[in-house]
Each structure stands twice: as structure tokens, then as C-alpha cells.
Amino acid sequence: MRSDFKDNHQETINKMIQFGTVKYGIVKQLKDPARSAEKDIASDQEDNGACSPLTTANASASAGNSPCPSRSPQQHSEDEREPEQVSEQELVPEVSAQSESEIGEEIENNADETNADHNHNNNNNNKLVMTKPPVEHEVEQNANLNASMPNSTTPPATNAVIAGARAQQFGATPVTLEAIQNMQMAIAQFAAKTIANGASGTDNEAAMKQLAFLQQTLFNLQQQQLFQLQLIQQLQSQLALNQVKQNDDEADEELEPEEREDGETDTYEEEERIADMELRQKAEARMAESKARQHLINAGVPYANAPDPSHQPPHRCRLRRLKRKREEDASAKSSGASAKIFGEQESSQDALNKLKEMENMPLPFGADLSSSIITNHDDLPEPNSLDLLQKRTQEVLDSASQGILANNMADDFAFGDKSSDGKGRNEPFFKHRCRYCGKVFGSDSALQIHIRSHTGERPFKCNVCGSRFTTKGNLKVHFQRHAQKFPHVPMNATPIPEHMDKFHPPLLDQMSPDSSPTQSPAPATGLPPPSTSTLTQMQPSMSFASSPAFPGLPGIYRPPMELLKSLGATAGSTAGLPHPFFPQMPGLGAALKHTHDQSQDMPTDLRKSSGPSSPHEEEDNIAARLPVKSELMEEEKTEHTMEAATRESAEMEPLPLEVRIKEERIDEDQMHLQEGMQKPEPLTAYATPHPQQCLIPTTHAAAKSPRSLPLQCHARLSLWCSHPTTSNHACAVLTGSQTHLDQLPTPDNVPPTMPQREDFFAERFPLNFTSKTDDHSPIRSPAGHAHAHIPRSPFFNPIKHEMAAFVPRPHSNDNSWENFIEVSNTSETMKLKELMKNKKISDPNQCVVCDRVLSCKSALQMHYRTHTGERPFKCRICGRAFTTKGNLKTHMAVHKIRPPMRNFHQCPVCHKKYSNALVLQQHIRLHTGEPTDLTPEQIQAAEIRDPPPSMMPGHFMNPFAAAAFHFGAMPGGGAGGPPGATGMPGGPHNGTLGSESSQGDLDDNMDCGDGDDFDDISSEHLSNSNDPAATSDRRSSDDFKSLLFEQKLRIDPTGVVNINSHQRPHSAASNPNSIGSASASPSAPTSPSSQPKPSCSPVRSSCSPVRSVSETSQGALDLTPRALPPPLASSSSRSPYRQLLSVRRRPLARSVSSHRCVVPMVRALLSSQLPPSVGIDCLPPGLQHHLQQQHQHLMQQQXAVAAAAAAQHHHHQMQQHAAALHQHQEHLRREAQEVQQKAAQEVQQKAAAAAAAAAAAQRQESPQPPPRSGESSVGPPAQPNPLISARPPFGMFPNLPIFPPATTQNMCNAMNQIAQSVMPAAPFNPLALSGVRGSTTCGICYKTFPCHSALEIHYRSHTKERPFKCNICDRGFTTKGNLKQHMLTHKIRDMEQETFRNRAVK
């Protein structure tokens, strides 16, 4: 029989092993033959009188008394070792000891034969295959048995006999298991064979796909079968429990003697039943473990050994306890049953835990496939049923039939070669793949945005027009369209679901005439439908009620726009706390906070719910209460107000805390009360004398119904406010939160210049709500002159407001606003207007030149500028014009700061301001008569003609002294002298100055003074007519400029500051206390505010506009004037500034000796240190700290450079001194030769003249004594000063001749020279920051461009060069593209003219 069975089924077994169906496939193929064989053997045993096997469920009850001997203790020990024998790690377990009886031998032979039929070796691939042991057959057959047990009429004794026979069979049967150690290798061999036998590569690929597909599908089906087995196990446990209870009831009904006789039998039956259950549980656990091991083998993870054999599970101990209690009383059966139930649950829990661990392990190949098919992962311990199993099976079939399996298999093949590393589908490429279309994205956010294209979700909503967008970036781009009309409305970047649109109405819908601005969604409460104006007034004071027991409306309703504006007007006069959403309203946050605090102070009424039970009901209620028509709402509001007033007059009595009124009635009264209370005057002022002022109609009520409420209602309100049972602070808030009603216009009392109400609110929202005191707040009255009290904001422009009144509503085709376009009246613009009149266009936003359709009027206006070349937006700093306002804003980033806080460079002669130091240098050369590299027109074009308006406090210091860099200092007046400028505090004020590039990052923290102070100071510096000591200095302006340029700050090409002589960055002070001058008084004040206001006296201008060397060394071209030094007592005690100037005005013979005095003076000036507390004490704390940090950083970088500079300066001085001595010796030698020639001639002519000539020559050879330092004698001009002739090269622009050139060769092609010198030069970087500007950086304004061509075009904006000329109209353009756009206008005009001529000819 074995050979026939093996021969018949060997081919089927080999095929199923190849395709991975190792266990369940064999079971399916061998299940029916094995059952038939077992039934035959059972019938034979029944005829022989032996114990029937498990399948003989209908055996007679007498079989229980058949000669089946009881098992010996040896057999019990073998039963205890049974888990070891059936372990999956043993290929051939030990064979149990055979029974002594013939029946036991027959059962054993039967088991051996059945086992032998189930175990086969794969001769093709020599792999050990784990077959289904007889235990698993018993599990399946027992399931069939138990399924029929409720309907079976077999007595309990029969079942006991069957169970006993079954236990003997399993106890004596050797169980043989064959582990699936290398199933994956077997599949790999099949794949190798398929590849080797394949005809082409495509066939091999198709075979591999089919193999993988079958393997994954079978794996999922095996997992589903495992679920089914678990469900069957739970059903068996329930049936066994019911059977135990049934047996207990029948045993209790029997007599006591019979109970004693059958006690051992019942105990034995129960013991055998538990043993049977134990075997079934072991089979299930073995199945789970085999599945887990197969899973681990596929994953390449070494499988852990089986648990310790010495460990005995709880059910084994329970079995021994039942055996020991077999001789005891019959009452032990109940305890054994309970222990059995507990053991079943525990063993079932162990199997479930193993299954969960198997499910949680990562699968490298097809893990997501199983998870996508089995989508419902319920908790297994939950009670299940057959219906749930059918539902799960149907779900699996439906999911597998939808193509998801094939799609995921394609993904698996993409990662099939990466399955060994354990990553697989967790890689980023697969992680961000769209399940709809298969696209792969680089991040999760990009995938989410893409999924919105499939779902149609647009979560970002524009709070102005209501348009929706999929991303926040698209919303930002769209919101720029509203920036011009709504500059103060912030963008709402929070995603708003579409079902919440009713709570977030757009601003344009609120302003449209169809819906009143005061209309808003009604709060979802159990109130009757209130009016819209009542709702707008309800939120600020809804938190108070007439009784503390009623909290009123909870603060969950979002206030509409109109309410926020009202709150801003009210709270602006009381508190200054900012609001998070409307920072322009300083009092809005305080008002809302006060309202919130009041709502929190009120006790909570728990007797009744104040809102709907679910969000859907809330939305339904709100949708039901939304106003349909404004006229209907007005009528309802009027009726509601009158009814509320009548009820209030009838019921508004003193309300003690004990009285309980319906909450609906209280809420209606509250709504009416909140409409009334108005003025924040003391409560006593309105209690008796002016009751009518306590209640004012609302905005909407005053618009349509001028009549006021009855006086009885006002009296009631006054009495209520003054009642002792009501809290006073509640009345105060009720009256104080309504002040804004006096300052808001209504639709009826809008001024005549405002015909459209929505434009009025758009113009004034939300910045210009000014706060007024209570004394000037007029009381609202129905009179028509109420609009006269509407406050005007400081930024309100009546002309602009009137123009805005004619602007059409959004989405309208009204073109009347085009009359107010600010366009220069050029010929091209007029031609375009004529073309627009003559040409028929189909779309109002269509271009008449190129027929392009734009999105809006503003886009069309900007598009026309591309044709006309107009640039209406001009930068006031550099004079550059732009076509759009956005480009101008982007350009302002080049200047680093806002125009009002800009620190300009000013000419000390004519006070003209320039934004760039290079242009100021060229401008100064115009005053000194030196040649310039820029033309006067170019210099004039770069001039800042319109200085920015003053927005700083007028009492502050000079802006150029406050915003200066920390290198310089500003000397103040002496002990009794006046300060240096009008409007400026006196004293040794250490202001600082910096160039454009160095102080750009610091100007945001600086406070600048009034621009007029700058002009006053500059004029005082130049009003030197009353100073007799300054006469010689005015005659030497050239010498003054030359000296300034000689002592300027040297900067290396790398951007590192290189300072002359012993100059240090922090020691550039001109404090009179550190100069050592005789006029510097040590008692000079040290604070800017320590001196009185200066007066205009001639003494204050007694000094020259000469700055110290330290001041001139702050920047290359920083010539901003400072405050004047203290007045000098006499010419003998002249300051070092005068002595430095006097060097160049002395004869050459005295220059050498004077240089010896000047060098120590310069060193004294440059070595004087600036105290940190004095140098920057005038600056704000944040700027002071920043300057100190910059100062320390600069000191560390300049440590090595200063030493090298000192050595270089010393070497330079020695060279200058040697050159001066050499020139002096040459001069003496030439004079000696001339004297000798004259002497020889005189000897020949007159002998008497020889002695006189010799005496004269002797006088010439004798050296002259050195002059005093205080002398100011002026001699004839001699050779140039060697200090000037041997100056070192300038470091800011190495190729640019900053100083006057010696020859005229450098003056050719001035524009080319400045372009060549500026572009490759290193930028001006006094802070020695890291280089951030490349070779495409403009050397004038330091703006970086992407390429050299863009930089070349940019330089034309500075030079005003327009090389591209139009041949028709001779108009110049900076770029060729602009010229092409301009030529389109001529082409269209010529085409129309030719068409007109052709028509005329015809």
C-alpha cells in the first residue's frame, strides 16, 4: 500500500514542493486517502474488540469495557516526554514503548502505517519536507467530530471510551516530523531549472514573475488558513466546556454507589479529554511555530532553538494533578474542569502571542502585499464566529480581485534584488510613491500635495476673495494681488476645510452690497434666530448675565470682521495690548482678553446644555439661522427688539439668586441688554439724570430705523445697572465695551463723498480706527449730522478716498478707474490710449498691442509698461526706476535699510547727499577743480534730491552722529563753550560714522534724528566768516582735501582694514580729554544732555570744518561733518588739526623740521583710546552691545596687521625723511654753484665786491635755526611736499585713481576706466566679513547679479546710458529687449496707417 501510494502521488508532491505549497498542499492531496485508510483500520479493530480510533464516533457504549488495560507509570512518563517527541527540531523522534496488549500493537501498527504513508523524501531535489503529522489530522477530524457533538446521541460513556482509545493511540504512536529547513532553496532550484531550460530571456522573466506571484498568493492563503484554525480552536473550547458542564449535571443525578463505581471512570475520562485537548493545542502551537520558522528561513534569520525541554507547561502539571486525584472523591471533577478551562485559555494565548510575533516580523519580499490584502486586523482574543470568518474570506477575495496584488508585485520585483539587506519597500524611493498613479516623490509633503490632485482637496483659502488653493505657496502668490487694495489685511495661512466656509466668510463677500458688512454666521445655541446686528454686539458682552447662575453664551463663537473692527476702536483708548491676528489694533487684544476673563469668572450652569449635542447639529443650526435677506432680517430684528423690551419691562425686577428663570428667556434679555449699554462714564452719572444715554441703538438699527427704544426700557436698564444684586464690574464692561459705536459710521450716515459703503470699509479697515477720549466722544443720535463726528486717521487721504469711491467693485467690468492711473503723458502712452479707443477687444483685460489676455487690470497695466518702457516706481535712494512696485521692494533690499533710516554721505561744501561714497568722491572733485571719472550729469543723476521724511523724534541727536560707526568720535564744546550744533546736546558727544557697506546691518537698531538738524550742523560748519583764524583755511580747500585723502583708512584687497601708523580701530577718538590740547577742559560734561540748549553765536563757528585724522580714517569717502571742536584760546595753542594743515603751507626749508613735530602729534591722535562707555553711550543698548562685539572681533583680526602697518609706516617715514634731506642738499649745492659763478664775475669786475660776495656765500652755507611750532609765516611755494608725492597706493579700488592723477593718460575713456576699476575691485568691507559678493557684484551699489551681462546692463542704470536707439522716434533704451517691445508699437501703428491708406485709395 505504501509503494502504491507513493508511486501515485510522487509527481503531485514534487510539483507542490516546487511551488512552495509544502504543508497544506500535501495535506489537501493526502487527506481523503488517509481518512479512508483509517476508517478501514477502525472497522477491523471494532470487529476484533479493540478500542476504536478517533473517527469511530458512533461506537457503542460497551466499548468502554473492552480489554483495554490501563497505562503503566512508564507510559505516563512517556506521555510527559511527548512534547519533546513532537518538537519541530527533531527529524525522527523517539519511538514510544509499545503496549503489551494486542490492541495496543494493532493501534501502533496502524499509526506506523499512517505515518509512513505521510512521510516521503523528495528524490529530485533531496530536500526534507515537513508533512502533516497525525496530530494535525486529529485536529481536523476532531473539529468534524465536535461540530456534530451537539446533535449526537452518543452517551457520555461512549465519548469517554473514544477519548481513552484516542489517548492510548497517541501515547503509543511514534510521531515523525520532517522540518522545512530549505524550502527557499528548493524554490531557488526550480527557478534555476526554469532559467536553464528557458528558450529566451523574456520566457525566464515571465516564469520568475509567475513563480513569485504564486508564492506570495499561497503564503497569504496559508495565513488565512491559520486564522481559520484559530477560530476552530475557540469553537472547540466552547463545545468542550459545554460538554463538561453536561457531564457534571448527569453525574450529580446518579446514585452515590454508582458514583463511587464510576468515579474512576469519570476521572479517567476527564483526564483523557484534557490530554486530547493538550494534543490539539500542541498541534496548533506546532503549526504556528512551523509557520514562524518558515517565515524566518525566508527572511534569512537564524531560527532560535526550541524552548527548554525541562520546562513543563501548565497543562502538563494539571494532567498530573488529575491523575493523582483519580482515587479521591468525585468532587475533584469540578476543580479539574476549571483548571482545564484555564489551561485552554492560557495555551490559546501562547499560540496567539506566537502568531502576533510572526506577523510583526519584517518580510523582505512581499510584506506589504499581505498587509494590503488582509486589511482588517482585529484583535484575535475577541469573540469570533463563522460569519466573521466568511466576512474575512470575502474581504480577502475582493481585495485580491482588484489588481492591488499585481501592482504590489511589480513593486516587489523592483526591490527583489535588495531583499537580502532587509530594506525592501522601506526605502525612500518606495516610501513616497503615489498609490493612485505610481509617481514617486522625494518627500512626504510633496506626496501629500500630489494626492490633493487626486482627491480635489484645496485646504488653503484666501480670506479676501475666498479662492481656494492646494498649497500655501500658491495662496501667497495669489494674495499679492490684494496687497494694493488691502495692504493691512494679513493672509490667513491656516488650512480651512470646505465644510467650515460658513464660519470664515471672505472679506469681499462681507463688503458686497448683497450681504451687509455686519452679517455673519449666527452662533449655534438653543436661542431663537437673532438678528445680525444683535449678533455682532452679542460677543463682547455675552459672558455676563443678569444672574450669576446663567453663564450666557460660551466664548466659542469666532467674532466677525465688523466686530473685530468695533473692538479695535473701543479698546484702543483703554489698553495697549496687541492682538495676535490684528496687531494694528492696539486695544483689540485687551478687549478680547477682558471679555474672556469675564466669561471665565462667571459660574457654569450645569443644569442645561447650552449647545447642540454634535458638531453636525451645530452646523445645521447655524445654516438654518443664516440670514437670507437683509430686509427680512431688519424687520425681524425690529420686532425682536420690541418684544424683548416689552418682556424686559414686565419681568426685569430685582433678581435674587434663588429665582430660576428659563435660560432661553434670560438669553433673550441678555441680547437686548447688550444692545443698549453704551457710554463708559461712571455708573452714577447714568443711573438717574440721563437714563436715555445708557441705551443706544446698534449700527444696523440706526441705519434703517431712526426711532429709539422706549424710555421705560432705558429706565429699566438704569435700575438694573444700579441694582445691588448685580455686579458693578459687569455693568462697567457693558457700558465700556460699546464706545466704538460712536466712532463707527453707519450705511445711512456715510459722508456724501463715499457713495459705496464697501469701499469705505475697505479703505479704513483695519488700521485707521483711532481712539478718542470719553470727553470728545459724541453720543450717537438719529440726526443726519452724525457723520460729522467720524474720526479721521492720520493716514487718511481725502483725495485718494474720493478716488477710491469711484473704483468699481471686484469682478466688475467698469473701466472708469482708468482715469486715475498715474502714467506719464508720453507720446507712447497717448498712442496706446488711442489704439485702445479705436480697436475692438473682446476681453476687458486684453492687450491692444499683442492681443494677450491678462488676469486683471493691474496685470494689464504692468503689461503695457513692457511696450511703453515706462517705469513709474522710482527709488529715492539711487534714483533707479522700476515697472512694478514689487520690483522696487526687492530693490530696496540692496540698500539694506528702509529709506527713513538711511545714513547718507553728504558733501561738506554744498550739502548734497549721495548714497554711494564713490559718487561723493567724484562730486568733491568738482569743488576742488580736479578731473573726475564721472561726468557731471552722471554725478547729478546719483544725487538724492528728495531726502526721506523725518520719522524720528526731533529732540534726538544728529542722525549721522547717532548712526555712525564706532571708529570715530565727535568732540563737543569746552567747559564754557557752546555745543557744536543747534538742536543737538553739547558735550564731548562721541558719535560714530560709518560708510554705506559697513553700517547696513546696524542701521535697523539705530535711532536717527531729524534731517533738518543735519542741515543746521552742516551750515554751521561752513559759516566761518566770523572766524579770523579760518581765513587761511578757506584759501586752501585743495590742501584740505588732499590732506583728508592722505590720511584715509587703508583697506587691503581682501577687505581687511589696514590703518596708518599706530592707528587702531578703537582708538580713533577726538575727545578733547584725549587729544592733549590746551583748550580741552577736563571738566567737560560727559553726557549729551548735560549742557543747555545752544545759542547761535559767532564763537561756536570759530573752528575750521577740518576733521581729525581719526575721523577721516573711518571710511574711504565718509565726509559727513561732525560737531565743532572747542574754541581755541590763541594761535600759539592751536590744535593738532591746525598744525597738520599748517605743514603744507610752510616753506620747504621748514617742512623737515615741522615733520618731526607732526609725527608725534599724529601718533598722539591715533593712539588715544576711546573709552567704551563714552564712545557709544549715546546709542541704544542693543546697538551698543553689537558695536562692542564688532569692536572685539575687529581687534582680534587686526592684531597682526597693526604691527605690520606700524613697521611699514616707520619705513615710509624714513624714506620720506631721506628724500627730504636729499632735496635739501641738492638745493644747497645749486645755490653754492650760483654763488661761486657770481663771485668770479664780481672779482673780475670789482675787486672790492669779492669780500662782500665771500661773506654772502658764508651766510648761505650756515644752517638756519628750526622755526617754532606756533609760527604761521607763509613763504613762497616750493617743491611738492614729499609726504604727498610718496603716498602709498589706495586699497579700496586699486585700479581706480582716487587721488588726482599726475598725468593725463588716465583721464581717457572715463566711463570705461571706472567700469574696469570697479568691477574687479574688492568690496568695501571694514568689518572684515567673509566675502559674499562674487565677480558679478556691482561696485557702486553692491548688488549681485547672476551673470556678467546682467551686471553690464545694471551699470547702465548708474551711467544712464541707453545704447539702443529707435530709428523711428530716436528714443533710447537700456536693453535690446525693451527696444524690441517698443518697436511693436510702431509696427502696429504703421500697419493701421497702411490699412487706412489702402481704404482711402479704394
Curated annotation (Swiss-Prot):
Keywords: Developmental protein, DNA-binding, Metal-binding, Nucleus, Repeat, Transcription, Transcription regulation, Zinc, Zinc-finger. It comes from the Eukaryota. SUPFAM superfamilies: beta-beta-alpha zinc fingers. One of its GO terms (molecular function) is RNA polymerase II cis-regulatory region sequence-specific DNA binding. Residues 1020-1029 have a biased composition (Polar residues). Residues 32-42, 594-608, 631-650, 1223-1233 have a biased composition (Basic and acidic residues). InterPro entries: Sal_C2H2-zinc-finger, Znf_C2H2_sf, Znf_C2H2_type. Residues 32-103, 244-271, 489-547, 593-651, 974-1038, 1058-1137, 1205-1289 are annotated as: Disordered. A zinc finger (C2H2-type) spans 432-454, 460-482, 845-867, 873-895, 905-927, 1336-1358, 1364-1386. Residues 57-69, 532-547, 1067-1122, 1234-1261 have a biased composition (Low complexity). Residues 974-989 have a biased composition (Gly residues). GO terms for cellular component: nucleus. It is found in: Nucleus. It holds the Pfam family zf-C2H2. Residues 249-271, 1001-1017 have a biased composition (Acidic residues). Belongs to the sal C2H2-type zinc-finger protein family. Required for the establishment of the posterior-most head and the anterior-most tail segments of the embryo. Probably function as a transcriptional regulator. Could repress the transcription of the tsh gene. This is Homeotic protein spalt-major. The lineage of its organism: Eukaryota, Metazoa, Ecdysozoa, Arthropoda, Hexapoda. The gene is salm.
